[in-house]
Amino acid sequence: MTGIQKLVFQVRRDIVRMVHANNSGHPGGSLGCTEFFVVLFFDIMKRKKKFNMNGYDEDLFFLSNGHISPVFYSVLARAGYFPVEELSTFRKINSRLQGHPTTHEGLPGVRIASGSLGQGLSVAIGAALSKNCLLYTSPSPRDSGK
């Protein structure tokens, strides 16, 4: 098993643990895009170890469909942006790891609040006017009028 395959396995384990511990969340979408997120964050994206909201000299990532936050949080933790142990606080009161990522929580790696499907597309297009950026979204934005 390669390092990437081991990481995919661990991220999937994190997702199941987070969702099961709270009896709440969207495991299907998160589990379905785990390989994409792991390869993107650990093999493709140009990113720095320490998160910088401005994203100078690195690729930008925006998550539009925030309901897949378990995979996003797990990958951010595994990338070293915050302690892996914090994953156990997913969807708990006063946790930075809510059902949809938000910027006011100050969580490293989160550039935009997500929730309204398609919102990330507009943000990513705006950022792309000045630099290279990456966006992952569900097919739903086409149906949301964005």
Per-region residue spans from a language model:
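Cofactor-binding active-site loop characterized by glycine-rich and histidine/acidic residues
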Residues: 15-18, 30-135
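Conserved small/polar residues in nucleotide/adenosyl-binding loops
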Residues: 136-143
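Non-catalytic, mobile gating and regulatory segments of ester bond hydrolases
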Residues: 1-4
